[in-house]
């Protein structure tokens, strides 16, 4: 089976074709992504209206390119999937409308994909991972620990009570006057800094429920900046390093609590999967590798290009659902909010 996947929930326009082999393995035939970094750089963050207009400008050409690079015609597809949320509603509507139009014109099944579910299932595309497993989703918009028990069967163990991890990185970068996107810039400066110089708080450490919080940590960084008044390059590097170290400690502590809760409520975990753009952060990756080694658990880190938003993950989630007979009506509405654990209408524990 082949499915076209379309992703437009934030500031990447993406289209991909993925094939599901009879034995259950997936193959990415094409994966086209157009970033909007240049469009948003002057504003220091994503502007929803600009993002939606940029999606409109490129989506048709990107879909044609994905089909061409996959050597696939519209008639060869078995289904067309699009991220229907959560995300910036204007952008979501662009991708969803495009997919619906293609499905209607080609008389192919349409699959509305939860963007978070696509992240959750990517490890099954890259590593043929069996259920159940623990998912740490860390991105600009979401920070969650989730028990992935099957397609459409998710138990949220913990989540952020304020900012997402990626959002906090971007806000710290903006405070420090670093270029957009801020996350990679903070990591780059942190590599040159002294993480022990500033003793920033580690929010939520020791709490019995594996939730996250970043607002207090952000405030601590801001207050330290105000105390220093004029920041030297060394100050900036040390602030970034100390902030990143605090985030890493929080993630590991929360993951430890999440794993314990997973084992109590679900049972043994086949692996820990890390997804979302923040999964590309080297310090976080190294800390999670140590944590999983100590916990006797396999760590699955999809390639960086599949951690950030992309069409292949949407196509794969579409394939997983289509193979179970789960298709959607063309009246399916775009959703700005769509909690992953509410998407439980289809429960499946086998390997598609």
Swiss-Prot record:
Keyword Cell membrane: no
Transmembrane annotation, as ranges: none
Top-level taxon of origin: Bacteria
Molecular function in Gene Ontology: iron ion binding; N(6)-L-threonylcarbamoyladenine synthase activity
Subcellular location: Cytoplasm
UniProt xrefs under InterPro entries: ATPase_NBD, Gcp-like_dom, KAE1/TsaD, TsaD
Pfam families attached to this UniProt entry: TsaD
UniProt-annotated binding residues for Fe cation: 115, 119, 309
Catalysed reactions, semicolon-separated: L-threonylcarbamoyladenylate + adenosine(37) in tRNA = N(6)-L-threonylcarbamoyladenosine(37) in tRNA + AMP + H(+)
Enzyme class: transferase
Cofactor (UniProt): Fe(2+)
Residues involved in substrate binding: 137-141, 170, 183, 281
Family of the protein in this entry: Belongs to the KAE1 / TsaD family.
Function: Required for the formation of a threonylcarbamoyl group on adenosine at position 37 (t(6)A37) in tRNAs that read codons beginning with adenine. Is involved in the transfer of the threonylcarbamoyl moiety of threonylcarbamoyl-AMP (TC-AMP) to the N6 group of A37, together with TsaE and TsaB. TsaD likely plays a direct catalytic role in this reaction.
Name of the protein described by the UniProt record: tRNA N6-adenosine threonylcarbamoyltransferase
UniProt source species: Methylocapsa acidiphila
């Amino acid at each position: 089976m082949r499915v076209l996947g379309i992703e437009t929930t934030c500031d990447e326009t993406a289209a991909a074709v993925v094939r599901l082999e009879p034995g259950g393995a997936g193959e990415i035939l094409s994966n086209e992504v157009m970033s909007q970094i240049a469009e948003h750089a002057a504003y220091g963050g994503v502007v929803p209206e600009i993002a939606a207009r940029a999606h409109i400008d490129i989506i048709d050409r990107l879909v044609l390119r994905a089909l061409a690079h996959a050597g696939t015609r519209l008639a060869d597809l078995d289904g067309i999937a699009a991220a229907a949320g959560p995300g910036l509603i204007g952008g979501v509507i662009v991708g969803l409308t495009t997919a619906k139009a293609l499905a209607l014109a080609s008389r192919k099944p349409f699959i509305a994909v939860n963007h978070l579910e696509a992240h959750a299932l990517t490890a099954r595309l890259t590593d043929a991972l069996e259920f159940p497993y623990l998912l740490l989703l860390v991105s600009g918009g979401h920070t969650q620990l989730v028990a992935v028990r099957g397609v459409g069967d998710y138990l949220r163990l913990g989540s952020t009570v304020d900012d997402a991890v990626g959002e906090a990185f971007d806000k710290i970068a903006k405070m420090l006057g670093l270029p957009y996107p801020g996350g990679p810039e903070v990591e780059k400066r942190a590599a040159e800094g002294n993480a022990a110089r500033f003793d920033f708080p580690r929010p939520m450490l020791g709490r019995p429920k594996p939730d996250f919080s970043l607002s207090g940590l952000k405030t601590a960084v801001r207050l330290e900046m105000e105390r220093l008044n004029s920041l030297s390059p060394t100050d900036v590097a040390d602030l970034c390093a100390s902030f990143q170290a605090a985030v890493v400690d929080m993630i590991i502590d929360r993951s430890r609590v999440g794993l314990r809760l997973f084992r109590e409520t679900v049972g043994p975990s086949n692996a820990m999967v890390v997804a979302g753009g923040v999964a590309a952060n080297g310090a976080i990756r190294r800390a999670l590798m140590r944590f999983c080694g100590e916990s006797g658990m396999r760590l699955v880190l999809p390639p960086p290009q599949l951690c950030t938003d992309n069409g292949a993950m949407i196509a794969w989630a579409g394939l997983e659902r289509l193979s179970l007979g789960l298709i959607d009506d063309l009246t399916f509405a775009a959703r700005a909010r769509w909690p992953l654990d509410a998407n439980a209408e289809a429960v499946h524990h086998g390997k598609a």
